[in-house]
Amino acid sequence: MIDEIKAQLDSHQKVMESVKGELAPKIAAVADLLVDALGNGKKLLVMGNGGSAADAQHFAAEIVGRFKMERRGLPAIALTTDTSILTAIGNDYGFEQIFRRQIEALACEGDVVVGISTSGTSKNVHGALLLADQVGCRTIGLLGKDGGTIREIVDVDLTVSCDDTPRVQEGHITIIHIICDLLEKRLFG
């Protein structure tokens, strides 16, 4: 059992080294996008499925509440939280439309839309990001594996190049925390 624990921690460390080596400039670019958008009255919309839905909620909570600094709240919405909206859209239009319909209703030009997908192929995230681009939003993918089809359609992809979903999720939440830290320091530091 101890060997398995050490192997998992080694795997985690390898992913973090990859994130540090490959994604630092892109993380900075995303922080810049968010500083610009939120500093100019725009909002953040975040979505994902399963564990990525939880990450979307976590991201929005850090933006609306706070990460480390006492500051005013900033506008962010996790498109994963309203069960009435999700089930109404899912029932009437299908699961692939649950985020797209919300983008149609809530997104404005200049907003930032983040799609989180450990596979990079979530159809409901993909469709919503396409619409967000048409609306004039900046689009970001927090992705895994090779980035899948979503990597090709976003303005900035933060792809954690790993096939192990738990390690990808660990990379995603670390990236989210770094972005929140940079954002607060730039806007309020």
Swiss-Prot record:
Residue ranges constituting the SIS domain according to the UniProt record: 34-189
Species of origin: Geotalea uraniireducens (strain Rf4) (Geobacter uraniireducens)
Cofactor, how bound (note): Binds 1 zinc ion per subunit.
Entry-linked Gene3D superfamilies: Glucose-6-phosphate isomerase like protein, domain 1 (3.40.50.10490)
Predominant subcellular localization, coarse grouping: cytoplasm
The protein's assembly and partners: Homotetramer.
Family: Belongs to the SIS family. GmhA subfamily.
Keywords associated with the record: Carbohydrate metabolism, Cytoplasm, Isomerase, Metal-binding, Zinc
Pfam families according to UniProt: SIS_2
Its EC number(s): 5.3.1.28
Miscellaneous notes: The reaction produces a racemic mixture of D-glycero-alpha-D-manno-heptose 7-phosphate and D-glycero-beta-D-manno-heptose 7-phosphate.
GO biological process, one term: D-glycero-D-manno-heptose 7-phosphate biosynthetic process
Name of the gene this protein is made from: gmhA
Entry keyword Metal-binding: yes
Keyword Isomerase recorded: yes
CDD domains in the record: SIS_GmhA
Name of the featured protein: Phosphoheptose isomerase
Pathway, per record: Carbohydrate biosynthesis; D-glycero-D-manno-heptose 7-phosphate biosynthesis; D-glycero-alpha-D-manno-heptose 7-phosphate and D-glycero-beta-D-manno-heptose 7-phosphate from sedoheptulose 7-phosphate: step 1/1
Cited function: Catalyzes the isomerization of sedoheptulose 7-phosphate in D-glycero-D-manno-heptose 7-phosphate.
Binding site for substrate: 49-51, 62, 91-92, 117-119, 122, 169
Listed GO MF terms: carbohydrate derivative binding; D-sedoheptulose 7-phosphate isomerase activity; zinc ion binding
InterPro entries: GmhA/DiaA, Phosphoheptose_Isoase, SIS_dom, SIS_dom_sf, SIS_GmhA/DiaA_subfam
Reactions accelerated catalytically: 2 D-sedoheptulose 7-phosphate = D-glycero-alpha-D-manno-heptose 7-phosphate + D-glycero-beta-D-manno-heptose 7-phosphate
Cell compartment(s), UniProt: Cytoplasm
Domain of life: Bacteria
One GO CC term, this protein: cytoplasm
List of residues binding Zn(2+): 58, 62, 169, 177
CC cofactor: Zn(2+)
